[in-house]
Amino acid sequence: MGQKVNPLGIRLNITRTWDSVWYADKDYSTFLIEDQKIRKFLKKRLSHAGLSSVKIERTGEQVRIKLFTARPGIVIGKKGAEIEILKRELEKLVSRKVTLDIQEVRRPEADAQLVADNIAQQLARRVAFRRAMKKAVSSALRFGVQGIKIACSGRLGGAEMSRCEWVREGRVPLHTLRADVDYALSESHTTYGIIGVKVWIFKGEVLSDKDKGAVAQ
């Protein structure tokens, strides 16, 4: 089961929380579509800023958006000029008051989404897929992750028949629910078609207070 399902969804409320935090009754579908619009817009708008994830909270008519990015300086801009423009664009998109909170990703080499996006960009520039995968694996292991797995699928190297190639180093225990596994999917648009890039990063086990006491004894 752990091999098939999304590693993030199966670990909700165990090692990670929801990306959208709000409650709605009759407006549920409206808010859900708004969240999708916000994420799609930000992914396109901040494609050069190393955007890792977007967390959305709602209170009344206000929307609070947390952006986790590897390059906060690009998002904020000189004297906060860029973030003000971005805020106005988002308010126009959703017709609500928007508050932005920028958080820096201090170890982008150990962030699954940033690793996947980086490999996808390299494949679009015609870098050999094996070289891109091995470089990402060695960089992640240098930053202290306990295991990493990368899979690329599509017409790799311009081959006539599509296939899937993967590389793994260390442990990536997908069946262990207390394992903190970060997962991401990215797409590389090449002249031969779309190449899918999947990344799993194992950062260690998250133990409860009861388990920590048992380990200490």
Curated annotation (Swiss-Prot):
The keyword rRNA-binding applies. One of its GO terms (cellular component) is cytosolic small ribosomal subunit. HAMAP family: Ribosomal_uS3_B. CDD domains: KH-II_30S_S3. This is Small ribosomal subunit protein uS3. The keyword Phosphoprotein does not apply. It comes from Desulfotalea psychrophila (strain LSv54 / DSM 12343). Binds the lower part of the 30S subunit head. Binds mRNA in the 70S ribosome, positioning it for translation. PANTHER family: 30S/40S RIBOSOMAL PROTEIN S3, SMALL RIBOSOMAL SUBUNIT PROTEIN US3C. Belongs to the universal ribosomal protein uS3 family. It comes from the Bacteria. GO terms for biological process: translation. Gene3D superfamilies: 3.30.300.20, Ribosomal protein S3, C-terminal domain (3.30.1140.32). One of its GO terms (molecular function) is rRNA binding. InterPro entries: KH_dom, KH_dom-like_a/b, KH_dom_type_2, KH_sf_prok-type, Ribosomal_S3_C_sf, Ribosomal_uS3_bac-typ, Ribosomal_uS3_C, Ribosomal_uS3_CS. SMART domains: KH. Keywords: Ribonucleoprotein, Ribosomal protein, RNA-binding, rRNA-binding.
